Amino acid sequence: MRYIIPVLSILFFACGENKEPMIEVLQSIETSKIEPPKSLMQLYYDKHNQDSLYSISKGTVSNGKLSNAVLFPPKGNNYNYFSEQSYLKGRAFVNSEVKDILLDALASLENIVPNQQFQIMEIAHEHGGELWPHRTHQKGTSVDFMLPKMKEGKVDYSLDQKGISHYFLNTNNNGVYDDSDGVKINFESTAKEILALNKAAILNGWKIKKVILKIELLDDLFKTPSGKKLKQLKIYFAKSLTKKVNEVHDDHFHIDFEKK
């Protein structure tokens, strides 16, 4: 910048009354601004994504395969993929139609919850199969969603940048995170997110087959205004889970999508 100002001054006086060369110089400087470097996740996306493919999911969510997978984008206007480490290890591949469902739902949420950034968590490997330590996620139709959070009535993202370790966060049965100074689950935003996902699934010819959220948190979810609407839809929420599976679904909710 220290050298640009003197150069512009010389050009200005050299141009005299003819302003056109000066305007061209300014426009050239404006258009030649250096773009910020792409993130590692964006570079990975650019290299591996194949949006034109139509995916085929075979088998079950716990014993399945995925062909022609597409890669979920690392970020958008109101969402991010939660972990660079997970993304670069190829754990964000998805069935192409499920990707459409997610993007349609997130687009609608821009208007429904305009002040909320959502976090997409792990999905599947490029060819499906085991995604350790998950018991499912094997055919690109299972998706984990980070639970939206709040503190003192306001949106809070203080725990959202933990990456993979977010899976190890714990809440009490009222949705308050341990050692967080009062950060808690935003159940209203959670319900709105699931409603949007359900609507997008239906419009794309799919449905939500199952939602997994810690059972002790369901009452607080269904008490919210949007939670009451969610309960009326009779979407299946798992009510019988092993202790281990139940306990690990307090920082996120899991959805299995199924084509109608």
Set out the residue ranges of the language-model regions.
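C-terminal motif of bacterial Sec signal peptides marking the signal peptidase cleavage site
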Residues: F13-A14
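Catalytic cores and adjacent binding grooves of peptidoglycan-active enzymes
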Residues: I23-E30, K154-K260
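Acidic/His-rich structured neighborhood in mature extracellular/periplasmic domains
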Residues: H125-V176
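N-terminal low-complexity, Pro/Thr/Ser-rich intrinsically disordered segments
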Residues: M22-N68
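Positively charged n-region of N-terminal signal peptides that target proteins for export
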Residues: M1-I4
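Envelope-exposed proteins and targeting segments
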Residues: P114-Q116, K139-V143, H249-F253
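Active-site acidic/histidine clusters and adjacent loop/turn architecture
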Residues: Q50-I120, N186-I202, K207-I208, I212
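Extended, low-complexity, intrinsically disordered C-terminal regulatory tails
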Residues: I101-W132, K210-S240
